[in-house]
Amino acid sequence: MQPTLLLLIAMTPDNVAQIAEHFHVIHAPTRAERDAAIARHGQDVRIVLTNGSTGLTGAEIAAMPKLELACALGAGYENIDVEAARARGVAVANGAGTNDACVADHAFGLLLATVRGIPKLDRSTRNGVWRDDIPLQPGVCGKRLGIVGLGTIGMQIARRAAGFDMQIGYHNRKPREGVSYRYFDALKDMADWADFLIVATPGGAQTKHLVDQTILEALGPNGYVVNIARGSVVDTAALEAAIRAGKLGGAGLDVYESEPKPPAGLLDLEQVVLTPHIAGWSPESVQATVDRFLENARGHLAGTGVVSPV
């Protein structure tokens, strides 16, 4: 008999079918379906597949006495109650490294689109406007890029920035060994120095509103911020206020605090480029995350352990 798996996130039919080759899948991607599935099948669930945004609460873990493994499909796991899981002997794993390149590509795409004003240039062109009537947008090559969170995704972003001859700085809790990029102990100092910030730090309570009014205004009226991390890291109200007041040049956001609803206060701002939390999604990267989940699950069930533990 196949182990019972509770799937809490939306996935394509092909991906669900691939997982269903190995597990009895209970697919519950909405809140109502989730609550009903745990109430009805909680006694049987051995594995949960979720993601960082959707998470898994301590109460839900307690309602599944046979639960052995909680997996986040991507790298983020900020809303999984890891302490509650460990207290009950539940292993926790994620998909670290599976979509780093895709996220970094998207981050740089947002940077280029925002700084160069590509979406608004596209709209103007479709409306018959020629270049002589359009204000010039700044370039990217040779500028100073500050990366907030130089983890595996941050390193991929830095590699792409090097191809644009950018000066690269980063802010972490501590310097990263073996890295020659300029380290900033204080984020404010990096914002003062940088032309652009790309936010690639984990979400959660420790980084909530890390990029606030002070940081945005330090970046300045010619500065731009890109967020491909978690919406909670950037103070949306402060971001809107800074752009409207001319204290920040613009922003490219794949994530925002109002998800899945778009950030209402930013929708009329042409200096803002928005995408629907899709930076890590491509056919290749999604397949890699599913493959990693299956690796983790097989390792756990075989007694050899997960490949990418949290």
Please tell me what each predicted stretch does.
Residues 2, 86, 93-105, 259-310:
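C-terminal helix-to-coil terminal segments
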Residues 88, 95-144, 156-159, 163, ...:
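Phosphate-binding beta-alpha-beta segment of Rossmann-like dinucleotide-binding domains, i.e.
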Residues 28-29, 73-74, 90-101, 172, ...:
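Short beta->alpha connector loops at strand-helix junctions that form conserved
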Residues 21-28, 89-90, 179-187, 269-273:
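Active-site regions of enzymes building and remodeling cell-envelope glycoconjugates
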Residues 56-58, 173-265:
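Rossmann-like adenosine-cofactor binding region
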Residues 46-47, 69, 196, 224, ...:
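Short, Asp-centered acidic motifs that coordinate Mg2+ and/or phosphate
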Residues 1-93, 212-217:
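An N-terminal-biased, well-structured beta-alpha scaffold segment characteristic
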